[in-house]
């Protein structure tokens, strides 16, 4: 995968040199290039200006973005604009982006963008219902969530298939050694070696956690007959 990032602050992306994303780059599975669009700005390198019609704040000018975009070697990329008004990013979106060969992220600052910048864009994406100083942190979050889904980046595909949200449910509780730590012991079923009982326990706990913490996820989740029975039991126990 090739990722190009248009930003005023390339140095902010140093975390992408480490952990899973860094290893993906070392393996040659990922190429990330940074483009400081201030370097392409005309008018004394100014990248922002006052909005027509008045108003508070400054807007990111179209010219530096267009010229930086034109300078990128590309074929048919998904072009992502980080915008609080965009569609909210989630695991399904990360899985979709992981199928792409080329991604371009446009990270803004200031009050907003000249609307004409959006003619370059295929996706307007937000992390959530809040405003960040710039798009860099949002871009890093999306890149991390996406890159770890690329085949061969994580050793076992099942490692991320069991993650929260990948199945539509929150992930079940997990434990490792020691068995007893400060009086807190591992559930007996996990020590039993009985794979079917372990599967059932994990499914029950996933449903329980989702029901308690993110019941909204269940509105779009297609329950199996087994899951319907478990969820009914969970609800009954909560009453």
From Swiss-Prot:
<dbReference type="GO" id="GO:0052906">
    <property type="term" value="F:tRNA (guanine(37)-N1)-methyltransferase activity"/>
</dbReference>
<keyword id="KW-0963">Cytoplasm</keyword>
<keyword id="KW-0489">Methyltransferase</keyword>
<feature type="binding site">
    <location>
        <position position="108"/>
    </location>
    <ligand>
        <name>S-adenosyl-L-methionine</name>
    </ligand>
</feature>
<feature type="binding site">
    <location>
        <begin position="127"/>
        <end position="132"/>
    </location>
    <ligand>
        <name>S-adenosyl-L-methionine</name>
    </ligand>
</feature>
<comment type="function">
    <text>Specifically methylates guanosine-37 in various tRNAs.</text>
</comment>
<dbReference type="GO" id="GO:0002939">
    <property type="term" value="P:tRNA N1-guanine methylation"/>
</dbReference>
<keyword id="KW-0819">tRNA processing</keyword>
<keyword id="KW-0949">S-adenosyl-L-methionine</keyword>
<dbReference type="InterPro" id="IPR016009">
    <property type="entry name" value="tRNA_MeTrfase_TRMD/TRM10"/>
</dbReference>
<comment type="subunit">
    <text>Homodimer.</text>
</comment>
<dbReference type="InterPro" id="IPR029026">
    <property type="entry name" value="tRNA_m1G_MTases_N"/>
</dbReference>
<dbReference type="InterPro" id="IPR002649">
    <property type="entry name" value="tRNA_m1G_MeTrfase_TrmD"/>
</dbReference>
<dbReference type="GO" id="GO:0005829">
    <property type="term" value="C:cytosol"/>
</dbReference>
<dbReference type="Pfam" id="PF01746">
    <property type="entry name" value="tRNA_m1G_MT"/>
</dbReference>
<comment type="similarity">
    <text>Belongs to the RNA methyltransferase TrmD family.</text>
</comment>
<protein>
    <recommendedName>
        <fullName>tRNA (guanine-N(1)-)-methyltransferase</fullName>
        <ecNumber>2.1.1.228</ecNumber>
    </recommendedName>
</protein>
<dbReference type="InterPro" id="IPR023148">
    <property type="entry name" value="tRNA_m1G_MeTrfase_C_sf"/>
</dbReference>
<keyword id="KW-0808">Transferase</keyword>
<dbReference type="InterPro" id="IPR029028">
    <property type="entry name" value="Alpha/beta_knot_MTases"/>
</dbReference>
């Amino acid at each position: 995968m090739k990722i190009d990032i248009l930003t005023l602050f390339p140095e902010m992306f140093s975390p992408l040199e480490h952990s899973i994303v860094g290893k993906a780059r070392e393996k040659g599975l990922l190429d990330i290039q940074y483009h400081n669009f201030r370097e392409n700005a005309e008018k004394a390198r100014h990248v922002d200006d006052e909005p027509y019609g008045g108003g508070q704040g400054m807007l990111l000018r179209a010219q530096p973005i267009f010229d930086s975009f034109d300078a990128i070697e590309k074929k048919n990329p998904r072009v992502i604009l980080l915008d609080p008004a965009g569609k909210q990013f989630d695991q399904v979106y990360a899985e979709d982006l992981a199928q792409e060969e080329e991604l371009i992220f446009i990270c803004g600052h200031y009050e907003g963008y000249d609307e004409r910048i959006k003619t370059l864009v295929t996706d307007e994406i937000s992390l959530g219902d809040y405003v960040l100083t710039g798009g860099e942190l949002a871009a890093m979050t999306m890149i991390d969530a996406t890159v770890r889904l690329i085949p061969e980046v994580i050793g076992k595909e099942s490692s991320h298939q069991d993650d929260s949200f990948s199945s539509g449910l929150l992930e079940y509780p997990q434990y490792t050694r020691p068995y007893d730590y400060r009086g807190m012991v591992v559930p007996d079923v996990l020590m039993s070696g009985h794979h079917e009982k372990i599967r059932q326990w994990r499914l029950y706990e996933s449903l329980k956690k989702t029901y308690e913490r993110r019941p909204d996820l269940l509105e779009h989740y297609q329950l199996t007959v087994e899951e319907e029975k478990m969820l009914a039991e969970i609800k009954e126990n909560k009453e």
